[in-house]
């Protein structure tokens, strides 16, 4: 968590209208917020309208010009930090999950190179996008909340964060990707966005390891993130011509 990045993004979110709950925030993390009357979590599986608005919010965010206070959020580097912290109580996790770590370390440079080829740079990202962080009020107004993980990242991470934390079918995943991009993806785009799912999953898998190491419930993120990491990592590597 980087409070400078969070502060910048939270105020930007207020300005561009994707989190109208904000009144004031300070560097220490204290916030004054409007009370959101009868707030509920969005349900993207049941509401195409909510999903469409949620994806539009991400595009608005990604168009914000960040200042020098916003730090880079590197999924793989940050994930390995959490894994190392968790190793203090869980044993040598780098060794236990050496195969997955090695594959992610091979995949990420390929994804970055593909992003450059496709013209995708680092943008302001939320980095913790999933249904519980999208609220709607009694009038249907949607709020994207919880900006603690904000940082510069590839826009694909903000859709990858959603896709890696649920056990969705290929058809469900395609619905989210098509809504995010706004059309049917090209073959190159599809390879890139699918390959980002295990990159996003790796961070939340490591986050789950960390939460478990400090006695918190780790199952909500750990299990689906782990399953999606395993499900997509080999497929992604093979899509870039990498074999076992």
Where are these regions (language model features)?
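ATP-binding pocket architecture of kinase catalytic cores
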Residues: 1-76, 81-82, 88-91, 95-98
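Conserved active-site beta-strand element of glycosyltransferases/polysaccharide synthases
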Residues: 33-34, 143-144, 153
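An alpha-helical support segment within catalytic cores of ATP-dependent transferases
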Residues: 66-127, 138-139, 229
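ATP/Mg2+ or Mg2+-diphosphate-binding catalytic cores
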Residues: 87, 91-95, 99, 206-244
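Pre-DFG segment of protein kinase catalytic domains
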Residues: 124, 143-146
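Active-site activation/catalytic loop segments of kinase-like enzymes and analogous catalytic loops
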Residues: 156-185, 198-217, 231
């Amino acid at each position: 968590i980087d409070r400078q990045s969070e502060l910048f993004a939270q105020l930007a979110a207020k300005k561009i209208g994707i989190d109208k709950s904000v009144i004031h925030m300070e560097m220490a993390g204290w916030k004054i917020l409007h009370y959101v009357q009868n707030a509920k979590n969005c349900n993207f599986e049941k509401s195409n309208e909510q999903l469409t608005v949620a994806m539009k919010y991400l595009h608005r965010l990604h168009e914000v010009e960040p200042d020098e206070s916003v730090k880079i959020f590197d999924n793989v580097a940050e994930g390995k930090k959490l894994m190392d912290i968790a190793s203090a109580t869980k044993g040598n996790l780098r060794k236990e999950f050496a195969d997955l770590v090695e594959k992610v370390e091979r995949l990420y440079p390929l994804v970055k190179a593909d992003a450059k080829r496709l013209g995708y740079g680092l943008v302001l990202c939320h980095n913790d996008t999933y249904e519980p962080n999208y609220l709607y009020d009694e009038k249907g107004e949607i709020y994207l909340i919880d900006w603690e993980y904000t940082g510069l990242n590839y826009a694909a991470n903000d859709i990858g964060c959603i896709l890696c934390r649920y056990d969705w079918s290929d058809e469900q995943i395609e619905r989210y990707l098509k809504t995010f991009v706004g059309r049917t993806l090209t073959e190159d785009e599809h390879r890139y966005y699918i390959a980002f799912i295990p990159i996003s999953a790796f961070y939340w898998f490591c986050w789950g390891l960390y939460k478990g190491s400090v006695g918190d419930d780790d199952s909500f993120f750990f299990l689906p993130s782990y399953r999606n990491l395993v499900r997509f990592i080999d497929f992604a590597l093979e899509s870039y011509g990498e074999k076992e």
